[in-house]
């Protein structure tokens, strides 16, 4: 691919995204599909666009993204994290603004495991007094 592109890896829950950005017209391609085709939910599309909208760079970059693992929400979060990292590689002076918005920090929350003797991670079986 082109030499003038920047790369960022993003992760969220069990999803990981590889994001390549290069100067362009604002075209976003995720796993060979457009943003609208890939994410049916408007909330997921909004999450993906957040870093670009924050910096007023929506129409300035073309994004080529590959994402795998997890569900819709996790993938959207991973893409957002990847875009943020790629933008910081492009221009380090953007870090402060992105950090203030909370996009730089990796969201470390994971699904809590199910425990033996419980129905779910914390849900206990119904208690019967008699």
Curated annotation (Swiss-Prot):
PROSITE patterns: RIBOSOMAL_S9
Record GO terms (molecular function): RNA binding; structural constituent of ribosome
Record-linked SUPFAM superfamilies: Ribosomal protein S5 domain 2-like (SSF54211)
Entry keyword set: Ribonucleoprotein, Ribosomal protein
Gene Ontology CC, one term: cytosolic small ribosomal subunit
Keyword Cytoplasm belongs to the record: no
Family under the similarity heading: Belongs to the universal ribosomal protein uS9 family.
Protein name: Small ribosomal subunit protein uS9
Gene name tied to this protein: rpsI
